[in-house]
Amino acid sequence: MRSLYLSFSLTIIFVLVIMHAEAKAISEPNAIAEADPGIFSALKTLGKILLPVILPTVAEKIKEKVG
């Protein structure tokens, strides 16, 4: 159960970071051209780390609830 909370927390953080990047791009038209490449590499790294952790955990919890 703790791992499920952790995976959901990390997912929420990941979504908030993406929303922040999108809001910055909308508010500043040239933001994508001038964007700090660090945030995009951080997003890629987060995605590579989170997806393999979250998907199996969520699938396992769903199987426990269903079956």
Swiss-Prot record:
Protein localization:
Secreted
The record's GO molecular-function terms, alphabetically, read: toxin activity
Give me the Gene Ontology terms describing cellular component. Answer: extracellular region
Tagged with keyword Secreted: yes
Summed up, the tissue specificity of this protein is:
Expressed by the venom gland.
The entry's keywords: Amidation, Neurotoxin, Secreted, Signal, Toxin
Which N-terminal residues, if any, form the signal peptide? 1-25
Q: Which residues form the propeptide?
A: 26-37
Q: Which residues carry this modification: Valine amide?
A: 66
Q: What does this protein do?
A: Toxin that causes a rapid and irreversible paralysis when intrathoracically injected into insects (blowflies). Does not cause spontaneous nocifensive behaviors by intraplantar injection in mice. Exhibits hemolytic and cytotoxic activities on HEK293 cells.
User: What protein family is recorded?
Assistant: Belongs to the formicidae venom clade 3 family.
Q: What is this protein called?
A: Myrmicitoxin(1)-Pm6a
